[in-house]
Each structure stands twice: as C-alpha cells, then as structure tokens.
Amino acid sequence: MLMLIPFSLIAATFRTLKSPSQGRITVFIPKYLQRRHCLKASRAKGLLLISQQEKYKSSQNIKSKILSSVAFCALPLALLCSSSLVLADQKPKTNEGFYNPLAITKPDPLLPNSVQPLTPAQQLKLKAALDKLNQQAAARLAAGDSVGAYGIWNRELRLRRALGFQEEVEALGRVGAIAWSDNQRSQVQVITQRLLEIQQQILSKQSSLSLLNSLGFAFQQVREPRRAIATYEQILARTRLAKDVAATQATLRTLAELNLSWFDYTKAAANYQELLNYATQAGDRQSSLTYLQQLDYIYEKSKQYQQAVAVKQKLLGIYQNDPQLSLDLPSLRLAIGKNYQALNQLQAAFQNYQQAYNSAWTLQQYALAGDALRQLISLYRAQGQIDEALQTSQILVEAQQRASNIYGMMTAYDLIGQLYLNRANYSEALGAFQKGLELAQQLRYQETYFAQQIQQVNQRLSQ
C-alpha cells in the first residue's frame, strides 16, 4: 500500500527558509537524501511516492523528517549567505585563489578614520606604533608562535601603506626575508604579489631612485632575481641618462653580484667589464684588481679559457709590481698553464708550469712547487718523454719532503714506480714501490695497494 503526500507540503517547507541578507533560498534535496527516505518526485501528478518500507507510518512523521532534512541541508547555506560580507573582509583571495591577508580592508584602530592624508604628526605616531608591532611579531616568532607573529606582521604591512610606498616596500622586503628563511611560502607569495602591484603602479610615474632601489632590494629579499634585475636595469638606464657615474657604478656592482649569484655568467662578465673600464679610466688600482679577479673567476667557471688567459695576463702585470701580491705569482702562473693546456697550447702551458715551479721553489712554497711539477710530469708522459718525467719525479719527491707531505711523497714514489714499469725496469720499480709501502704503513693507508704492486713486480722479476 502506498501513501501519497502532496508535493506542495514540501514546497511550503522550502518557502519558510530565508536568508537575512538574500531573501528566499531555493533548496534542493540531494540524491543521497532522496535514497535515504525513498523519495521520488512525480512531475505529472505533483506528488511524492513513499514506500511502505519507510520507518515513518504517517504523513505527519514524514513531514517532520523532511523538515529536519531540509533544514539540515539549508542551514549551512543560510549561514553562508548571512555571513558573506564578513567572509569577504576576513578571507580575501588573490587572482590565483589563495588567502591574501594583505588584502583585508576592515578599519584598524591605529589608523584615523579621516579620508584626508595623514599629517606629519599622525605619520610619526603611526610609524612608532608599527615599529612596536614589528617588535611584537619578532618576539612571537622567537617564542615559537609563527601564526601569531605573521598575523601581527600582516597587520603592520597593511597599515604601512598609509605611510607611502617607500615605507611599505622596505617593510615588505624585511618581512619577506624573514618569511623566506622561515619557509613560509604562502607568506612570501602574498608579499611578492604586493611588490608586483606596487611595481605596476609606479611604472607610469617618475618614481624616485630611492624607491626603485628599495623595490629591487625587496625583490632580492623574497628571492625574485628576475624582478630585481629588471628593476636595477631600469635604475641603470636612468643613471646613465643623467650621467651620474657614481650611481651607475653602484648599480652595476649590484647587477654584477646578482647575475653572478644566479649563475648568469655572460651578464655578470659584461657588468664587471664595464666596471673595470671605469676603474681603469679613474686609475683605481684596487678596484681594477677586484674586477679582474671577478672576471677571472667567471671565465674559469664558464670554461672560457681564452678570456681567462687574457685576464690573468693583466693580473700578472699587477702582481709583479706589488710586493704583497708577488707571493701569489706561482699560483697565478700555474693557473695560466692549466688554461693553456685546456686550449691544447702545450708549449705555452709547459713554460708557465716551469715558471710556476721556479718561483714557488724560490719562495719556499714547496707544496705549490709540487703541483707544478706534477703538471710537468703529466706533459712529459703525454709526449712520451719518460726520462724527463722520471727526473722531474725525483724533484717532486724532494719538494714533498720539504713540504712535510708524507702522502705527497707516497704518491710520488707510486708515480716513479709506474714510470719504471713502463720502461720494464722492474728492479727500480720495486725499490720505488717499497719506499711507497713504508710511507703507506706510516699513514695506514693504501698498504694493500703497494703490497700488490710489489708482489706483481716480484713475479715479473722471477720470470
């Protein structure tokens, strides 16, 4: 037996649900609720058919159940509608849809309600209050309350807008740096978005260089190198136009460091080359040295060995005329030799290795002399000049001995042993490996290796 319930009864129930702000709300019964109560709509008759298997036996019970269910479904919607204005203030979203605490616009007791710009006295008062907020936030973070800390900082950042872009940008950069080091990615994201908004607003204006510099630095603090570089390039164009040499050089230094730190060697080299030109024209010897060293580093890292040699030759001239820098001549000669070897200019490489060895030995830099000797031995072996390699290896042993480098002596004897093996001079090879074993036993390192070498040589001698 089926019981018929007028659909108008349920429709009337729907009409009783209202939102305080939106008026009437139409609420639909979800499918899972229809299945639960075995409800089926009949469009033709306008009736709902309810099976006898329902727990409720009377129309009154069914009405009560429907009212409860509909109210249960509609209540969250009603609450959502009635609080929509509050939520709009409390949880603003960015274009990407994430929560942006910097977009909250509700009034703040620290900010006067007047629409007029703040007077100088009001600005000083607000700035002092915001500095206190910054201190409170830092204390919260130190105490482990990161949520409370960033809540206070976000309030500070919102209020900083009343003090102008300069104050706001500096504060954004400061908090952004803290958030980045604290791994607060969402906080960094909203701060970066605000910096981009400010950048867009000042593009059409002839903003001060001070503001642009602050903006560029803030982009650095939130790890946005491309934005920072673009900002500094804008500054550079203006300083060049104004023929402000000091400001141009300062901006070039910033750009050079930025490009270098983000591994853009091409742009960094161009920046340092321009700085070198300025320093050379001004006769600034110390700055010239600094920029040449930076260029040398860049060319080494980018494996531009021809440019590296050219820069090192300029450094060589400076080192030779400065007694304090002359101690670095052996290492510079050694580096030049390696560059020439990488360029397959072996004769030039050999000459620089020889000069590196001679100057290092004269300055009693025996470890460095040993490095130069190893490079010479490598060249001799590559050219098949085994006798020269052996003679140089004997000097290498002495250099390592003077440097008190037991490990270096051990590897030198190993090298000598290998050279004698190449010439099938097994008795000399055996002597070299035995000396190497003695040193290995002192170090307790590679003892097995030398023992195996000795065993193999003895086997060949016994054949």
What do the PLM-derived regions correspond to, one by one?
Residues 2-36, 43, 51, 71, ...:
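N-terminal leader/linker segments that initiate helical-solenoid repeat arrays
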Residues 131, 170, 210, 250, ...:
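Residue register of alpha-helical TPR repeats
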Residues 127-128, 147, 166, 206, ...:
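Residue signature of alpha-solenoid helical repeat architecture, marking inter-repeat boundaries
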Residues 157-158, 196-198, 234-238, 274-278, ...:
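Amphipathic alpha-helical segments of tetratricopeptide repeats
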